[in-house]
């Protein structure tokens, strides 16, 4: 009779407690960790959609940021109620620049004095130059479909037709006629950048410089904080990535921008508005107005 302690050479004795069901603690720990990761990702996406992650998509601080689908999202909540201008400062080639990017606004042209209390204006700056001899506008100019001046003394142009702004350089362009036919706007100025290439201009000397620029369809205005030459200013615009740019009347020319907080930022000198100087009858401006009345 074999006892419990007896074992043959061809037998194996198992020592230990009987098998038990595996404990599910490790499995539940993994599930919990995965759930936490998913919740974190969802939270980040939600916060970004609430405008808390602007800098994640901002490669160039001069321009407004875009979400991955290409839609502007910085201060979208503000843009839905009123337009504004995003104001940003940077330095390129030791030249301090200030950029103005309009949101929720449409560009047009204006001749004559502006109403400084007009709450629909989010950006205004002098556009075409004025002749010193007869006070006429230099270069072709179309105001709400009406030609007010003709000529190609300067090859740079800016057109605003049906809400779309086009900046370019050409001796002849169909946009003058198109602006006339469709109630649009058109003016000419010195060309600064064409297809990403610097364009030299004859005027020398240094002054506060301004320009209206386009980069991949985005429109923004830039001014220098210090007095600069045409060449250095144009080079700075090339270096910030402007595809096309033309000049805006600089020096002490008056204008202003309204930021996302409703604060008005004036530049230049308002001598024409205080009566210190007589205002030219053909003084003209580019004007960005909010699409939604405040």
Model features per residue range: what roles?
Residues 187-211, 216:
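Conserved beta-alpha junction segments in alpha/beta enzyme cores
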Residues 135-152, 205, 214, 218-244, ...:
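Conserved, well-ordered active-site substructure
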Residues 125-126, 131-197:
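Active-site-adjacent helix-turn-beta-strand microarchitecture at beta-sheet edges
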Residues 103, 168-174, 224-227:
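Secondary-structure transition/turn motif
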Residues 97, 119-122, 153-156, 163-164, ...:
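Short, surface-exposed beta-edge/turn micro-motifs
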Residues 2-150, 222:
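Zymogen propeptides
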């Amino acid at each position: 009779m074999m006892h419990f302690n007896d074992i043959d050479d061809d037998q194996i004795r198992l020592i230990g407690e009987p098998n038990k069901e595996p404990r599910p603690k490790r499995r539940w720990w993994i599930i919990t960790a995965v759930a936490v990761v998913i919740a974190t990702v969802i939270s980040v996406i939600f916060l970004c959609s609430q405008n808390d992650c602007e800098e994640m998509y901002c490669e160039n601080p001069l321009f407004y940021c875009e979400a991955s689908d290409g839609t502007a999202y910085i201060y979208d909540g503000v843009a839905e109620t009123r337009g504004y201008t995003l104001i940003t400062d940077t330095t390129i080639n030791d030249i301090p620049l200030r950029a103005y990017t309009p949101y929720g606004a449409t560009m047009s042209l204006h001749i004559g004095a502006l109403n400084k209390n007009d709450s629909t204006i989010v950006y205004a700056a002098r556009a075409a130059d004025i002749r010193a001899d007869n006070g006429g506008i230099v270069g072709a100019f179309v105001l709400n479909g009406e030609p007010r001046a003709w000529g190609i003394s300067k090859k740079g142009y800016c057109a605003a037709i049906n809400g779309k702004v086009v900046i370019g350089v050409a001796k002849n362009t169909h946009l003058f006629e198109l602006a006339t036919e469709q109630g649009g706007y058109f003016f000419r100025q010195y060309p600064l950048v064409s297809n990403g290439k610097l364009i030299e201009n004859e005027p020398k000397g240094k002054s506060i410089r301004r320009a209206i620029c386009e980069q991949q369809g985005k429109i923004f205005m830039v001014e220098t904080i210090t007095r600069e030459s045409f060449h250095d200013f144009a080079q700075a615009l090339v270096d910030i990535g402007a595809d096309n740019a033309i000049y805006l009347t600089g020096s002490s020319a008056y204008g202003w921008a309204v930021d996302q907080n409703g604060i008005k930022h004036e530049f230049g000198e308002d001598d024409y508005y205080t009566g210190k100087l007589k205002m030219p009858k053909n003084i003209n401006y580019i004007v960005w107005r909010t699409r939604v009345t405040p």
